């Protein structure tokens, strides 16, 4: 990295509800820690504040990143404001407020530049995860309060779909830069594709991932593909309900719950799978799409999920569908058509290399540099373009 990088010696504080060591952590936390590592590589001093959990100590330094863990799933927001105000996170030059539905209200306790990182808008998720009044209050904060509070802040969205959704909430496009996820280098595993049809679902087991749709699809296809199996990789608070659902549907050996796997074992599943099913209600991007693509495994996903419209190139690296019956139909057609599946497999490999983490790190670093200089940036970090485009001066 250049010796005169503006980031050298600067302090950056991330406020996030989780980290990757949290049992409920997922792709959003992986994104955060990867771009944070990129800032460390460029000479910045980075602190990540997140909720406490049993899998990690209250404070530690990992790969140059300081982690401070306090509070619970809900109290983490108040604890984050308190820690920032008291100086427990140092004297940050830039604060990155990671808004997973709720913001940390950091603008109320700091005069430093704030960058708001958003993976997706939670309009559809609030009534699913928090039915009733709690969900309505959460959506009101995300829809009304946050855009007003951060009206002068820089935003980062992980997809164009998220950028468009933020625009619907009143966030001006000239303040939203798109910094996509990357894909890790391929994890070498052997064995090749399963000799019998196999579909995989990979991710946190929570209601909005709608794993039930994949279970229903595979069971509906059993008469046509008697050897078809579904392997479900991941864990989460909805896991027991999914086990019950599969049992009630008479899934038997057709549905296998693998639980949380090591990276090597997870990629072995990707390698063996004929197809990846991604029936999520919402995805800011869909990190698993690129991971599966590295192994030549195409994805079938819902178009309405948002970020899947960019991570899946419809008809080239996978198939996008519009409803649950469409998911079942697409899986059936691809399982039966080896030539089409092979064509999509080649496309999935190509697409998985379109965005790299190194590129995402430089693009995110460019946004932080702009914040330090009082500029706003917008546009997308398209391949071959190292910084988000269209710089503009900060709004008063």
List each model region and its residues:
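Conserved acidic donor-binding segment of nucleotide-sugar-dependent glycosyltransferases
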Residues: 313-325, 333-339
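A short, well-ordered alpha-helix in the C-terminal region of glycosyltransferases
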Residues: 227, 340-354, 363-366
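Nucleotide-activated donor-binding/catalytic signature segment of Leloir-type glycosyltransferases, i.e.
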Residues: 241-261
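Carbohydrate-associated surface elements
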Residues: 161, 182
């Amino acid at each position: 990295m250049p010796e005169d990088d503006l980031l050298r010696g600067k302090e950056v504080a991330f406020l996030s509800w989780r980290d990757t060591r949290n049992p409920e952590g997922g792709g959003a936390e992986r994104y955060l820690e990867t771009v944070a590592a990129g800032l460390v590589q460029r000479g910045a001093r980075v602190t990540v504040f997140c909720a406490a959990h049993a899998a990690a100590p209250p404070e530690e330094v990992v790969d140059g990143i300081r982690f401070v863990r306090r509070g619970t799933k809900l109290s983490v927001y108040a604890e984050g404001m308190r820690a920032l105000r008291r100086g427990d996170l140092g004297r940050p030059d830039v604060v990155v407020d990671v808004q997973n539905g709720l913001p940390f209200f950091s603008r109320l306790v700091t005069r430093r530049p704030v960058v708001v990182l958003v993976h997706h808008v939670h309009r559809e998720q609030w009534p699913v995860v928090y039915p009733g009044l709690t969900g309505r209050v959460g959506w009101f904060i995300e829809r009304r309060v946050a855009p007003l509070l951060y009206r002068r802040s820089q935003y980062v969205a992980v997809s164009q779909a998220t950028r468009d959704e933020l625009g619907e909430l009143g966030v001006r496009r000239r303040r939203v830069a798109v910094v996509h996820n990357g894909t890790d280098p391929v994890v070498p595993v052997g064995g090749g594709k399963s000799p019998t049809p196999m579909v995989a679902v990979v991710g946190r087991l929570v209601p909005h991932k709608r794993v039930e749709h994949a279970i229903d699809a595979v069971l509906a296809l059993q008469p046509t593909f008697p050897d078809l199996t579904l392997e479900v990789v991941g864990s989460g608070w909805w896991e027991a309900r999914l086990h019950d659902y599969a049992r009630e549907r008479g899934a038997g050996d057709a549905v296998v719950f693998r639980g949380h796997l090591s990276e090597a074992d997870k990629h072995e599943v990707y390698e063996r799978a004929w197809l990846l099913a991604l029936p999520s209600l919402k995805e800011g991007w869909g990190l698993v799409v690129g991971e599966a693509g590295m192994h030549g495994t195409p994805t079938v996903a819902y178009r309405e999920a948002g970020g899947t419209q960019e991570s899946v190139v419809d008809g080239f690296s996978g198939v996008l569908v519009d409803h649950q019956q469409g998911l079942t139909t697409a899986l059936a057609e691809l399982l039966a058509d080896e030539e089409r599946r092979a064509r999509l497999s080649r496309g999935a490999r190509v697409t998985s290399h379109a965005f790299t983490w190194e590129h995402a790190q430089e693009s995110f670093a460019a946004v932080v540099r702009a914040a330090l200089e009082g500029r706003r940036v917008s546009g997308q970090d398209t391949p071959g373009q190292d910084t988000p485009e269209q710089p503009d001066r900060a709004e008063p």
